[in-house]
UniProtKB/Swiss-Prot annotation:
It is found in: Cytoplasm. Its EC number is 3.1.1.61, 3.5.1.44. It catalyses: [protein]-L-glutamate 5-O-methyl ester + H2O = L-glutamyl-[protein] + methanol + H(+); L-glutaminyl-[protein] + H2O = L-glutamyl-[protein] + NH4(+). Coiled coil: none annotated. This is Protein-glutamate methylesterase/protein-glutamine glutaminase. The active site is at 182, 208, 305. Residues 5-122 form the Response regulatory domain. The lineage of its organism: Archaea, Methanobacteriati, Methanobacteriota, Methanomada group, Methanococci. The gene is cheB. Keywords: Chemotaxis, Cytoplasm, Hydrolase, Phosphoprotein. One of its GO terms (biological process) is chemotaxis. Involved in chemotaxis. Part of a chemotaxis signal transduction system that modulates chemotaxis in response to various stimuli. Catalyzes the demethylation of specific methylglutamate residues introduced into the chemoreceptors (methyl-accepting chemotaxis proteins or MCP) by CheR. Also mediates the irreversible deamidation of specific glutamine residues to glutamic acid. Gene3D superfamilies: 3.40.50.2300, Methylesterase CheB, C-terminal domain. Residues 177-363 form the CheB-type methylesterase domain. PANTHER family: PROTEIN-GLUTAMATE METHYLESTERASE/PROTEIN-GLUTAMINE GLUTAMINASE, PROTEIN-GLUTAMATE METHYLESTERASE_PROTEIN-GLUTAMINE GLUTAMINASE.
């Protein structure tokens, strides 16, 4: 079996060496070269054709975002961004994901020399996962749609979307939409949410993402959406026309008191399927309170999280949608759900917003 050829791109000689040592410790990985900036990386990609690239965000000469754009235009290659847990770092990382990077490695804070080695196993796993991902960017309708949306963005932070769902207001509080996503998901979730009209039931978004990144993810979506998108807060009342993003490193659950549903953010609940937030955990509570009026959507990602969640939706009589294989960066979570026979509709994400509203109207009458 041939080794996974990795190119490391970082302006820090120390970080290049640490990453190289970590990756070389695994027999299935070969570090073919290192580069100190995006320009050098692009030349090495043309020469060496690596299977995976680890890419720093902030670098001289050519930064990680511009390098990602160039590489994806020349030869789509799985790119893992190495990102700082700061607002600026999170924004840059999400921008790189919009431009084709498949995932990101959270750059440790504090004593880098100690912390980076602590997450060595995770880095190796992410590189292996990335090597299995599909990055045929040119053929992806959803990413072309995202690019168009970015071009259409004006200086106005929130677009004035005139269309509404047409749902009867009295039913909006009885219906809920759950969206679960992992690797390759942020641009897809963003595109779906940007095409959701006003007068829509509450949406619960579980994207596998660490603390700090989820808030920026929500803020970016909010700037391009007809509804309010926010990182979920402990104790807040669930409302229609709102999308709630589960905070990183916490589980998002629900509680009903009187006639209201409240969001509970629990940092102490364990990881399930090796991740927190977990789609399956939130699904248990969404289906508990919304039952047959739940619409479950499962998008690209590795592993099986969300498959049991869709099963819960089906068991309650709700409606389930999975992203099709052709558009998935990693066809893991949707594939598991489809194999479990708990998916009503398999489709391109570009068609999902319309499908959500169509089914919500059936519920809302």
């Amino acid at each position: 079996m041939s080794k996974i050829k990795v190119l490391i791109v970082d302006d820090s000689a120390f970080m290049r060496k640490v990453l190289e040592d970590i990756l070389k410790s695994d027999d299935e990985i070969e570090v073919v070269a290192t580069a100190k900036d995006g320009k050098e990386a692009f030349e090495l990609v043309k020469k060496l054709e690596p299977n995976v690239i680890t890419m720093d965000v902030e670098m001289p000469i050519m930064n990680g975002i511009d390098a990602t754009k160039q590489i994806m235009a020349y030869k789509p290659t799985p790119i893992l961004m190495l990102s700082a847990v700061t607002k600026q770092g999170s924004e840059a990382t999400l921008k790189a994901l919009d431009n084709g990077a498949v995932d990101f490695i959270e750059k440790p804070s504090g004593s880098v020399s100690l912390d980076i080695r602590k997450i060595g196993e995770k880095i190796i796993k992410q590189v292996k996962d990335a090597s299995k991902s599909k990055v045929r960017i040119k053929s992806s309708r959803i990413l072309e749609n995202i690019k168009k949306e970015k071009q259409d963005e004006s200086s106005t932070p929130k677009p004035q979307v005139e269309k509404t769902s047409g749902l009867s207001p009295e039913k909006l509080n009885d219906t809920a939409i759950l969206i679960g996503s992992s690797t390759g998901g942020p641009p897809v979730v963003s595109s779906i949410i940007s095409n959701i009209p006003k007068n829509t039931p509450p949406i619960f978004i579980v994207q596998h993402m660490p603390k700090g990144f989820t808030r920026v993810f929500a803020e970016r979506m909010n700037n391009n959406s007809a509804i309010t998108v926010k990182e979920a807060e402990h104790g807040e009342i669930v409302k229609p026309d709102h999308a709630y993003v589960a905070p990183g490193d916490s589980q998002m659950v629900l509680q009903k008191r009187g006639g209201n549903v409240y969001i509970i953010i629990d940092e102490n609940m364990p990881k399930i399927h090796g991740t927190k937030p977990t789609v399956d955990v939130t699904a248990e509570y969404v289906t508990k309170y919304y039952g047959k009026n739940t619409i479950g959507v499962l998008l690209t990602g590795i592993g099986r999280d969300g498959a049991n969640g869709l099963k819960m939706v089906k068991n309650k009589g709700g409606y389930t949608i999975a992203q099709n294989q052709d558009t998935c960066v990693i066809y893991g979570m949707p594939k598991t759900a489809i194999e479990m026979n708990v998916v009503d509709k398999v489709m391109d994400p570009i068609d999902i917003p319309l499908e959500i509203i169509k089914f919500a109207k059936k519920i809302g009458g």
